Amino acid sequence: MKVTDVKIRKINGESRLRGVSSITFENQFVVNDIRIIEGERGIFIAMPSRKTSKGNFRDIAHPINSETRQLIENCIKTKYQDLLDNPPQEEDFSQNSEN
């Protein structure tokens, strides 16, 4: 399975949540809301989940084997690190109105 796109929305704040990611496979299937979390031993990836009526969390989508999990984690962590190392330039839309 080939990863064809990874998008990350960086989140600034006091919580351990550092960002939210979407990953696309072979331009045909996307998994949204993958959380990027700062843990005690560094960044880790949490697959999208929902809270059950019993208060437990259950993954909505997740990899079946360790190779696929590693592929997803590596792609997201690499893209996240690239975002930290090369933040997007903010465009200045203000107009200088000197007459």
Curated annotation (Swiss-Prot):
One Pfam family in the UniProt entry: SpoVG
Gene3D superfamilies: Stage V sporulation protein G
Keyword Cell cycle found: yes
Alphabetic keyword roster: Cell cycle, Cell division, Septation
An example Gene Ontology biological process: sporulation resulting in formation of a cellular spore
Keyword Ribosomal protein on entry: no
InterPro entries registered for this protein in UniProt: SpoVG, SpoVG_sf
Similarity annotation: Belongs to the SpoVG family.
Role played: Could be involved in septation.
Protein name per its UniProtKB record: Putative septation protein SpoVG
Species whose genome carries this gene: Onion yellows phytoplasma (strain OY-M)
